[in-house]
Amino acid sequence: MIKKIISVFLLLACIITLAFTAFFYHSKLSDQTKSISSLSSQQAQERLQSYQDSLDFYKKLNTSLSVAIANSLRDKAVEELNAIALRIQENHGFIGVTFASLDGTMFTDIGTLDWNAKTLRRDWFVKTVELGTKHYTAFDIDKTTGQHVLTIATPVYVGNDIVGSVALDIAGDQIASPNGSGMFMMTDRNFNVFASDLTHSTLIGKDLTKEKPLFKNLVSGQYVTFSDADSHWFAVSQTEIDGENKLFTIIDIQQIVQTYKRDIQLIIAGFSGFSCVMLIGLYWVLSKELSGVRQIREWILALSDGQIKERRPIKFHNELDTIAQSLENLQFRLLDVVRNSHRTMNDLSIKQTDITYSIEGNTNNSQQELGLIEQVATATTQLSCTSFDVMQQAQSAELNAETAQKLIAESHDIIDSSSKQTEMVTLSIHESQQIINQLREFSDNISSVTDVINNISDQTNLLALNAAIEAARAGEQGRGFAVVADEVRSLAVKTQQSTIDIQGIILKLQEQSQLADQVMTRNVSLIHETQVANRALIASFNLISDKVLEISNINSIVSTAANEQKIVTEDVAKQMEDIRYLVQENLSAMERTKQANQNISDLTTNLNDALSFFKIELTS
């Protein structure tokens, strides 16, 4: 028990220590972040101020030069201007010093150049000379020296007139001096380094993102920490310059990191020591307060072995006294329970014997009832089957009657349809007979026409003969006419022969028309007889349909009665089955009751055996 309490206390102490350490860690981390941000911001501001001061100085210097050389530039004093440019370049270490006249001539520290700023439209020349404004460019890489160069240009006035321009080419590391405290790097918009402190001077002219990939994703106003090969910690931040250039400020945070680690270690050590002291004190208190647990444990073990005996009261002067008193009360209660249980078990054994006899009598009666119910159920089932057979036969007869009635109705429809078709055939035959009569009349008309044609051909033949005779009389002059007359007579003969053929055909046509008329008349008579037979057949089918309908109605009544009888017998059979089920359930319940009673007897015996476990020892 003491081990468990100490383990729980130790666990709680660890949790509290971890929680406080996490809180302190977060607090210190926040302080560290603020310190680093403050130092980075301060150093960046100092470096920006130094950069701006240098820029302002060179702007003022440029303005002073524009005043000093105004007259010389107006007069184009070549040697004097070149000498001044060289002296300024040597004194200040500029990349180049250029004086441009109004026509674009350029006087530099290396002499007068052979190209013209006005002709080439140099940006600094255009803005200072033509627009009259001061101008300084962004840092660009000089093609000659490879250095980043910033050009500052100022217009030169004589009175109110512009006579030229002064341009100073200043190296990047000259504006951003490597001297001073703190590490830094300045880059152009493409991350090319043009100025840095002495420590990082080797990076000048190189791409910072390739040399220091960590710096690429820096956001202005934030910082990133990193360590070198010697595990020395630094923090770097980025600041925008002039909207194009970037300033990377690096500060040494090794002391801040070491202070942070030391504070965390002190907190952990302090809480660990405090937890150990508390653990020792807790063990001493628990050992003293729980000294009586051993005696109570022995008492409980004796009760668990069934030993119930009187004990003298034990006093521990703490909460264990309540436990000891409760154990003493429990012992007295157990004694009463054991004695009462023995008496109850004896009475229960007697009652269970009586229950067993009653259950056996009820079981025998229920079995007899079950046999009688099964006989009634069997008879009811047979009656239900008979009713079902009658109902099926009646339904089958009714279905056959319905089928016959449908067939009769279909036959009736067919006969009606046949009668209608017969009437249509009769009408068609009448129409055909009329057409044949007309055809016979037309053939008679044609016969009269052929008679006319025959007469014409006879006359034509006669005329042709007369013409031939007259042509013969005419001699040689009538020979041509004789040929024509022969041809006409030949045509008349052919016409006469065709007329005879047509008359033969017309005669045959008239004979066939008369024969067709006779056949049509005979068909009309036969169709009339068929219609009479169809009407008689329809009357017979109607009579059969009525009889079949009566049979169907009788079958329907028989089927309904058989179905109702079947439903009643099935209901009786179902009721008998329910009664049989209930009787079986009663038998099962009695069997279960009997088994439960036997189980109770066994449990009573077991309980007596269990109660014998308690050994009662009473002092006199």
Curated annotation (Swiss-Prot):
Q: List where in the cell it is found.
A: Cell inner membrane
Which SMART domains does the record cross-reference, listed alphabetically?
Answer: MA
Top-rank taxon, per record: Bacteria
The Methyl-accepting transducer domain, residue ranges: 344-580
Q: Does the keyword Cell membrane apply?
A: yes
GO BP of this protein: chemotaxis; signal transduction
Q: Name one GO cellular component term.
A: plasma membrane
Q: How does it sit in the membrane?
A: Peripheral membrane protein
Look up the coiled coil feature and give its residue ranges: none
Which Pfam family, giving just one, matches this sequence? MCPsignal
Q: Does the keyword Kinase apply?
A: no
| UniProt keywords, alphabetically | Cell inner membrane, Cell membrane, Membrane, Methylation, Transducer
Q: What does this protein do?
A: May function as an environmental regulator of TCP biogenesis. Negatively regulates the synthesis of the major pilin subunit of TCP (TcpA).
The entry assigns this protein to a family as follows:
Belongs to the methyl-accepting chemotaxis (MCP) protein family.
**Protein name, please?**
Toxin coregulated pilus biosynthesis protein I
User: What is the source species?
Assistant: Vibrio cholerae serotype O1 (strain ATCC 39315 / El Tor Inaba N16961)
By which gene is this protein encoded?
tcpI
